[in-house]
């Protein structure tokens, strides 16, 4: 599960970077520009290349392995604790709220991944793969505005980003611990790195959602709708 988790973090790094290109477009005045001029349009074009087409099934397999193994481990731990789970015991130093709720956080994250895919993947890659329709560059910006133009949608996504933050802060360093790449010296360093990465991801994604809202509602000029 640790290997699949680290693999998914790498994909999240790519995904966050491409989404943040939309913010760069706003700063440079290239919102709505075609691929080659607009950063976000270029990123979306890259996500439709054969390299990514090959990666998508691998990513889906990685998600499946991660989810199934997480469920097996959680059920095994639940059964192993038995009545002990009701007892009051001293909490170890390494325990955290996130570590005790990884399964719940994972379910929330998974649910929103499906929700997110219904808004973006289904309207872009799915259309190109299964319907043979080319998605125009301006459409990716319009999709961003339509999705984040509603303040409630932005707030829902921010809740998702918060759950993702908690899941990543524990999952990152514990993945290295599981494969034996962590010790007393590196544990705190990996925890700090995990916190920094999770914060960077979630701040970038939150800013992207807010920028989409501001453009869609005319606060920032350049709407394509």
Give residue spans per PLM region:
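Membrane-embedded alpha-helical bundles that constitute the cytochrome b-like, heme-associated redox core
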Residues: 1-225
């Amino acid at each position: 599960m640790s290997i699949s988790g680290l693999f998914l973090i790498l994909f999240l790094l790519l995904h966050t970077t491409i989404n943040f290109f939309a913010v760069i477009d706003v700063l440079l005045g290239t919102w709505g520009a075609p691929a080659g001029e607009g950063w976000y349009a270029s990123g979306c074009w890259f996500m439709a290349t054969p390299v990514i087409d090959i990666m998508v099934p691998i990513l889906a397999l990685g998600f499946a392995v991660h989810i199934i193994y997480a469920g097996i481990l959680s059920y095994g731990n639940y059964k192993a604790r038995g009545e002990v789970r009701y007892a009051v015991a001293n909490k170890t130093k390494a325990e955290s709220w996130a570590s005790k709720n990884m399964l719940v956080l994972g379910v929330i994250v998974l649910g929103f991944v499906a929700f997110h895919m219904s808004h973006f993947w289904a309207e872009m890659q799915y259309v190109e793969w299964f319907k043979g329709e080319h998605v125009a560059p301006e459409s990716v910006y319009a999709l961003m505005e339509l999705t984040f133009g509603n303040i409630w949608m932005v707030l829902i996504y921010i809740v998702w980003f918060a759950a993702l933050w908690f899941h990543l802060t524990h999952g990152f360093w514990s993945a290295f611990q599981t494969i034996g790449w962590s010790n007393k010296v590196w544990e705190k360093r990996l925890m700090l790195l995990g916190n920094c990465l999770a914060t960077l991801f979630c701040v970038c994604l939150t800013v992207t959602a807010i920028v989409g809202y501001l453009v869609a509602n005319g606060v920032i000029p350049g709407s394509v709708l």
